[in-house]
């Protein structure tokens, strides 16, 4: 993620380093000013030449000017540092917000994955149940087909037996009819013979 206004972690580090260095310079300058003041006090106590006093005074003025310039630079660096810290805070909050959003999205994705996995498991279980039911039905159908085949064999055997019985019955009927015809012919022949004898007896008288 880019840092706004071109600031980076390395930039913030350099600002802090410059800030510390400026503080060291200011402390050194303040120490030097303190020493110069002590020298001036000693000069008041001990008479010195005008040239030496002017040189010391000039040096003191230069140090004060440098000190003031350093303070201005320090103030600018402090302003930059505060601005950088503010940006870091904003970025930290934004990062935390994005982190929470990411964790929420990740949690949602995980939840959906678990739901889909659960649905998948349920579908697999349902398919297994259906497959098991189909296998059972096929076993039942195979059993029924075997029963039907056995019944067909029994029926075929019964039909054959029936046909055999019918054939025997027809033969018996034919035999009975033949016997009846023979008996009828014999009966007719016997009747004819009796009638012939009955016609012959009166003539003999």
UniProtKB/Swiss-Prot annotation:
* Predominant subcellular localization, coarse grouping: cytoplasm
Q: Which residues form a coiled coil?
A: 17-166
Q: Mind listing the GO biological process terms from this record?
A: cell differentiation; spermatogenesis
Q: Which UniProt keywords apply?
A: Coiled coil, Cytoplasm, Developmental protein, Differentiation, DNA-binding, Nucleus, Spermatogenesis, Transcription, Transcription regulation
Might you report a single GO cellular component term? nucleolus
Bias type Basic residues, positions? 186-205
One Pfam family of this chain: SPATA24
Q: Where is this region: Disordered?
A: 180-205
Q: Where in the cell is it found?
A: Cytoplasm; Nucleus, Nucleolus; Nucleus, Nucleoplasm
Q: Which PANTHER family match?
A: SPERMATOGENESIS-ASSOCIATED PROTEIN 24
| UniProt name for this protein | Spermatogenesis-associated protein 24
Q: Whose protein is this, by species? A: Macaca fascicularis (Crab-eating macaque)
Organism placement in taxonomy: Eukaryota, Metazoa, Chordata, Craniata, Vertebrata
């Amino acid at each position: 993620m880019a840092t706004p206004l071109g600031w980076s972690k390395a930039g913030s580090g350099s600002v802090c380093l410059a800030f510390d260095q400026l503080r060291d310079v200011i402390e050194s300058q303040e120490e030097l000013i303190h020493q110069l003041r002590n020298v001036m006090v000693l000069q008041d106590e001990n008479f010195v030449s005008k040239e030496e006093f002017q040189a010391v005074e000039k040096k003191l003025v230069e140090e004060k000017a440098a000190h003031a310039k350093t303070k201005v630079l320090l103030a600018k660096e402090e302003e930059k540092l505060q601005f950088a810290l503010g940006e870091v805070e904003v970025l930290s909050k934004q990062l935390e917000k994005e982190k929470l959003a990411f964790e929420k999205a990740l949690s949602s994705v995980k939840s959906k994955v678990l739901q889909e996995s659960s649905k998948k498991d349920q579908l697999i279980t349902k398919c297994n149940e259906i497959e098991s039911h189909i296998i059972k039905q096929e076993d039942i159908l195979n059993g029924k087909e075997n029963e039907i085949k056995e019944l067909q064999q029994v029926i075929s055997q019964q039909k054959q037996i029936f046909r055999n019985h019918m054939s025997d019955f027809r033969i018996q009927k034919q035999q009975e009819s033949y016997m009846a015809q023979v008996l009828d012919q014999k009966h007719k022949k016997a009747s004819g013979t009796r009638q012939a004898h009955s016609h012959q007896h009166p003539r003999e008288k």
